[in-house]
UniProtKB/Swiss-Prot annotation:
The chain crosses the membrane at residues 24-47, 56-77, 99-118, 138-156, 194-217, 234-256, 268-287. GO terms for molecular function: G protein-coupled receptor activity; olfactory receptor activity. Disulfide bonds join 95-187. It comes from the Eukaryota. GO terms for cellular component: plasma membrane. Its main location: membrane. SUPFAM superfamilies: Family A G protein-coupled receptor-like (SSF81321). Keywords: Cell membrane, Disulfide bond, G-protein coupled receptor, Glycoprotein, Membrane, Olfaction, Receptor, Sensory transduction, Transducer, Transmembrane, Transmembrane helix. This is Olfactory receptor 4C11. CDD domains: 7tmA_OR4A-like. It comes from Homo sapiens (Human). It is a multi-pass membrane protein. InterPro entries: GPCR_Rhodpsn, GPCR_Rhodpsn_7TM, Olfact_rcpt, Olfactory_Receptors. The gene is OR4C11.
Length: 310
């Protein structure tokens, strides 16, 4: 049997084998990906350019948008190109790189969502100490720790993937490389590796989700003591965060907290959190946030005026 040191390439089966549906997949996900990149880049540029968006919440939103763009880019371009390709070939090195990038930016998104929840908790439950606790220096340290944690997680995942011995046929029943579909191709007992996968990715997803839900329950409970205006503003911000948390963590928990059994719905579930959620995040955070919308209007209004003067 050939093992992973001699695997030249894999073949991705993609979302569908039907030619007509592949064209539909191409159009839909091209729109989704372009929307994701444009939306998140718009948020990044707005936060960097606006003086009114200097609070820790927008500091973390900047990194969430960056992680969203990179997370989607780790899978979407190949899915789009493969939709029009007769043979969806990915080399072994490209596959391992995709596994690493997927987990690096996916984990970073999880950690940033936790930091945003911490920020909301301090802002609402400890408003007098907020400037001290969430100082710029503290926020930078937290983001650096998030990057370090993400790097450790993705390195652990790639080590597991590199240890897998593969035997032909090298057909991955997915649109991207990830540990779950790769485990199905391994010519070895994958019980221990799957246990490590669940204890790593599964534990991160499940524990982070529980931490986030509990923190937002505490935040919402504490809003009873706030004024109507303050309650409305805080509730709007928290609702946006809760929507993002549920949309992202639901599919992640489904994928990473069970044995490596392939269900027909797995690929569509993965599409939802790798491409769907990064597309929806900019819409959720801009449509429900008056400060971001106003900053965007000022930014582009000023840009139009400067162009007209020029």
């Amino acid at each position: 049997m050939q093992q992973n040191n001699s695997v030249p390439e894999f073949i991705l089966l993609g979302l569908t084998q039907d030619p007509l549906r592949q064209k539909i997949v191409f159009v839909i996900f091209l729109i989704f990906y372009m929307g994701t990149v444009v939306g998140n880049m718009l948020i990044i540029v707005t936060i960097k350019s606006s003086r009114t968006l200097g609070s820790p919440m927008y500091f973390f939103l900047f990194y969430l948008s960056f992680a969203d763009s990179c997370f989607s880019t780790s899978t979407a371009p190949r899915l789009i190109v493969d939709a029009l390709s007769e043979k969806k070939i990915i080399t072994y090195n490209e596959c391992m790189t995709q596994v690493f990038a997927l987990h690096l930016f996916g984990c970073m998104e999880i950690f940033v969502l936790i930091l945003m929840a911490v920020d909301r908790y301090v802002a609402i439950c400890k408003p007098l100490r907020y400037p001290t606790i969430m100082s710029q220096q503290v926020c930078i340290i937290l983001i650096v720790l998030a990057w370090i944690g993400s790097l450790i997680h993705s390195t652990a995942q790639i080590i597991l993937a590199l240890r897998l011995p593969f035997c032909g046929p090298y057909l991955i029943d997915h649109y991207c490389c990830d540990l779950q579909p790769l485990l199905k191709l391994a010519c070895m007992d994958t019980y221990m590796i799957n246990l490590l996968l669940v204890s790593n990715s599964g534990a991160i997803c499940s524990s982070s989700f529980m931490i986030l839900i509990i923190s937002y329950i505490v935040i919402l409970h504490s809003l009873r003591n706030h004024s109507a205006k303050g309650k409305k503003k805080a509730l709007s911000a928290c609702t946006s965060h809760i929507i993002v948390v549920i949309l992202f963590f639901g599919p992640c928990i489904f994928i990473y907290t069970r044995p490596p059994t392939t269900f027909p719905m797995d690929k569509m579930v993965a599409v939802f959190y790798t491409i769907g959620t990064p597309f929806l995040n900019p819409l959720i955070y801009t449509l429900r946030n008056a400060e971001v919308k106003n900053a965007m209007r000022k930014l582009w209004h000023g840009k139009i005026i400067s162009e007209n003067k020029g």
